[in-house]
Amino acid sequence: MTLNAESEALVGVSHPLDPLSRVEIARAVAILKEGPAAAESFRFISVELREPSKDDLRAGVAVAREADAVLVDRAQARSFEAVVDLEAGTVDSWKLLAENIQPPFMLDEFAECEDACRKDPEVIAALAKRGLTNLDLVCFEPWSVGYFGEDNEGRRLMRALVFVRDEADDSPYAHPIENFIVFYDLNAGKVVRLEDDQAIPVPSARGNYLPKYVGEARTDLKPLNITQPEGASFTVTGNHVTWADWSFRVGFTPREGLVLHQLKFKDQGVDRPVINRASLSEMVVPYGDTAPVQAKKNAFDSGEYNIGNMANSLTLGCDCLGEIKYFDGHSVDSHGNPWTIENAICMHEEDDSILWKHFDFREGTAETRRSRKLVISFIATVANYEYAFYWHLFLDGSIEFLVKATGILSTAGQLPGEKNPYGQSLNNDGLYAPIHQHMFNVRMDFELDGVKNAVYEVDMEYPEHNPTGTAFMAVDRLLETEQKAIRKTNEAKHRFWKIANHESKNLVNEPVAYRLIPTNGIQLAARDDAYVSKRAQFARNNLWVTAYDRTERFAAGEYPNQATGADDGLHIWTQKDRNIVDTDLVVWYTFGMHHVVRLEDWPVMPRQNIGFMLEPHGFFNQNPTLNLPTSTSTTQTGEADTCCHTDK
C-alpha cells in the first residue's frame, strides 16, 4: 500500500463522523506495521475512527482523518494505544499501557482458544476419563476470567466452559460438562491450567429447537405482509438520515456497535439539537449461583468482548420487515486484516398503533392519527445469548432505547433429582440454568437546544396543606454536582429525571427539557463487597451525570477485562464532583433484567424487552404532531379506506 495515497484512504468518506472505511482501516494498519508495530508478535484489537472534537465539528473547520488503534504485543505481554494520521501517514501517538491492562478479546482469539483446548493432551486425557473421546463433538466456549483476587498481571487469559453434542446440530447447552474449566493464555499460546473437579454426570436429555427436531410447523397463521408501495419515508445520504422531523448520523464501532450522532428535531423549520452522541456504553451479566463454575460468570459483553464485532449480518424478512436500509460495519481481525459485517445495522419504519385520538360525543365526530416509528437496530450474538439493540424515534419527539434479549440460556449440570435453589431445573436429567441479571448502561451526550444543560430529579410529593388527602405534586430538585447526581430509581415516588436548558425557554417561560422515564431500573443484586460489584459499580446506581470529558467513554472504564475496578469508570470520574449545572454534560442510565429463569425459556428463549424512554417535557409549545394527515390505510384493492379495512 502507498502510504501517501490520501485520495485512496478517503474513499467513501463524506463527513468527519463517518466510520472508517475498509481502505482507511487497511491504511492505518499498514502505517503501524511500517512503524512501531512491525514485529510479528503484535495483534490488533481495534482500529476505529478517532472522532473530531466537538468544538471542531461545531466550527466546521477541516479536520484530519485519524484512527485510534489498540494493540497487544504478545512477546512483551503488553498493550498499546496508537493515534494514526491517515492523511499524513504518520503515527502521532504511541502509548504503552500499564502492565495490568488487558484490552477486549478478538473473534479469532476465541477460535484460537477453542482450537488449543481441543488439542491439549491434558484436556484430552481428562475428558477421556469422563468417557468423552470424540473431540469433534466437544464444544469449548471461551469466557473472560474476570477478577477474583488473583495475580494475573501480564497474562491474557480466557477460561473455556465445556459442553458436548450428541451430533453435529445438537444443542451443546443441553449437555454441560460441569466442574471442568480450561484456562488458556493468549500471550503464551498455551493451556496454563485445567480445573477438573467433582464429576457430575453430563445431562443426556436433548434441548433442540431446529425444525428437523421439533417436527412440522403450524399452518394456521395467515400471511402478514408489510407493504410500502411508495417506499420508505426516510432519506439517506451516506451515513446521514432524515425522517419526518428527525435527522441524525449513523455510526458503528467495534466496542459499541450502533452509534447515533447529532440527533436533531426540526421544529417550526428549525433543526433543534437533542443528543450529540448516544450508544451502549457497557453491559454486564452477573450470575447468582454459588456453584464453583457458575459463581465466576460475569461477562462484560461490551468491554471484554467488543460487542460491535459480534453483530450479525441481518436479513430481510427475519430480522427486519418492510422497506429496509442497511449499513455495513467495518472492523479488523487480530492480524490487521480489515473485514466487513454486511448489513450490520438495519433501519426501517414500523406502524405504532394510535398516536392520538378524540371522539367528540357532542358533534359525533372523531379524529385519529396513527403513530409510526423509525427503527435503527443491530443484533449481536455473544456465545449463547442474542441481544438485539434498538433505537426508536417517534413522530412526537420521543426516543426509546430497547434491548430484546433472546438466544439460549447459559446452563449448568447438577445431580439428577437435585433442585438447585439458585436456578431453575430444565428437565429431570440434571440440567438447570442459574439465576442471573442483564445490566446495561447507555451513554447520552446531551445537547438540548445547545451545549449548556442541567439535570433535575422529579419526585411526587404530598403538600402540607392537603385537607382532602388527595393532593400530590411533582417537585423538581436540581442536581448540582456529579456526586449529587448518583441516583437510584424510586417507583414509590414516581421518579424521573429531566434534562433541561435554562437558556432556552418555552411558551410559558420554563426551560425546555426532555425527561428520562426510568423503566427497568434495577440495580446489581450482588453484595457491594463482591468482586463483580467493585468492577461493575456503574450498575449499583441507575443515574450518573458527568461533566463532558472525551476520554470518559465507557461506564466500567476503558479496559474492564481482568480489571479490579479500582482505577477507572464512572465511580472514579465522579469523585471529582464537578459542576453539572449549565454546562456540557453526559447522562448515563443503567437498567436491566432480573432473570429468574422459567421452563418456557428453554430450549430457546422467547424475546424479553428491556429499555427506557426519553420524552419531550416542555421542549415544544404544544403537541408537535397536529400536522399529521388523517389516518387511512390502503385496502388490498388499492383503494383508500378510512382508518382500516373491515369485514361487515
Swiss-Prot record:
<dbReference type="Pfam" id="PF01179">
    <property type="entry name" value="Cu_amine_oxid"/>
</dbReference>
<dbReference type="InterPro" id="IPR049947">
    <property type="entry name" value="Cu_Am_Ox_Cu-bd"/>
</dbReference>
<feature type="binding site">
    <location>
        <position position="445"/>
    </location>
    <ligand>
        <name>Mn(2+)</name>
    </ligand>
</feature>
<dbReference type="InterPro" id="IPR036460">
    <property type="entry name" value="Cu_amine_oxidase_C_sf"/>
</dbReference>
<feature type="active site" description="Schiff-base intermediate with substrate; via topaquinone">
    <location>
        <position position="385"/>
    </location>
</feature>
<dbReference type="InterPro" id="IPR015798">
    <property type="entry name" value="Cu_amine_oxidase_C"/>
</dbReference>
<dbReference type="GO" id="GO:0009308">
    <property type="term" value="P:amine metabolic process"/>
</dbReference>
<keyword id="KW-0479">Metal-binding</keyword>
<comment type="similarity">
    <text>Belongs to the copper/topaquinone oxidase family.</text>
</comment>
<keyword id="KW-0560">Oxidoreductase</keyword>
<dbReference type="GO" id="GO:0008131">
    <property type="term" value="F:primary methylamine oxidase activity"/>
</dbReference>
<feature type="binding site">
    <location>
        <position position="446"/>
    </location>
    <ligand>
        <name>Mn(2+)</name>
    </ligand>
</feature>
<dbReference type="InterPro" id="IPR016182">
    <property type="entry name" value="Cu_amine_oxidase_N-reg"/>
</dbReference>
<feature type="binding site">
    <location>
        <begin position="299"/>
        <end position="310"/>
    </location>
    <ligand>
        <name>substrate</name>
    </ligand>
</feature>
<keyword id="KW-0186">Copper</keyword>
<feature type="binding site">
    <location>
        <position position="584"/>
    </location>
    <ligand>
        <name>Mn(2+)</name>
    </ligand>
</feature>
<dbReference type="InterPro" id="IPR015802">
    <property type="entry name" value="Cu_amine_oxidase_N3"/>
</dbReference>
<feature type="active site" description="Proton acceptor">
    <location>
        <position position="301"/>
    </location>
</feature>
<dbReference type="GO" id="GO:0005507">
    <property type="term" value="F:copper ion binding"/>
</dbReference>
<protein>
    <recommendedName>
        <fullName>Copper methylamine oxidase</fullName>
        <ecNumber>1.4.3.21</ecNumber>
    </recommendedName>
</protein>
<keyword id="KW-0464">Manganese</keyword>
<dbReference type="InterPro" id="IPR054157">
    <property type="entry name" value="AGAO-like_N2"/>
</dbReference>
<keyword id="KW-1015">Disulfide bond</keyword>
<comment type="subunit">
    <text>Homodimer.</text>
</comment>
<feature type="propeptide">
    <location>
        <begin position="1"/>
        <end position="9"/>
    </location>
</feature>
<dbReference type="GO" id="GO:0048038">
    <property type="term" value="F:quinone binding"/>
</dbReference>
<feature type="binding site">
    <location>
        <position position="436"/>
    </location>
    <ligand>
        <name>Cu cation</name>
    </ligand>
</feature>
<dbReference type="Pfam" id="PF21994">
    <property type="entry name" value="AGAO-like_N2"/>
</dbReference>
<dbReference type="InterPro" id="IPR000269">
    <property type="entry name" value="Cu_amine_oxidase"/>
</dbReference>
<feature type="disulfide bond">
    <location>
        <begin position="320"/>
        <end position="346"/>
    </location>
</feature>
<feature type="modified residue" description="2',4',5'-topaquinone">
    <location>
        <position position="385"/>
    </location>
</feature>
<dbReference type="InterPro" id="IPR049948">
    <property type="entry name" value="Cu_Am_ox_TPQ-bd"/>
</dbReference>
<feature type="region of interest" description="Disordered">
    <location>
        <begin position="629"/>
        <end position="648"/>
    </location>
</feature>
<dbReference type="Pfam" id="PF02728">
    <property type="entry name" value="Cu_amine_oxidN3"/>
</dbReference>
<feature type="binding site">
    <location>
        <begin position="382"/>
        <end position="387"/>
    </location>
    <ligand>
        <name>substrate</name>
    </ligand>
</feature>
<feature type="binding site">
    <location>
        <position position="595"/>
    </location>
    <ligand>
        <name>Cu cation</name>
    </ligand>
</feature>
<keyword id="KW-0801">TPQ</keyword>
<feature type="binding site">
    <location>
        <position position="438"/>
    </location>
    <ligand>
        <name>Cu cation</name>
    </ligand>
</feature>
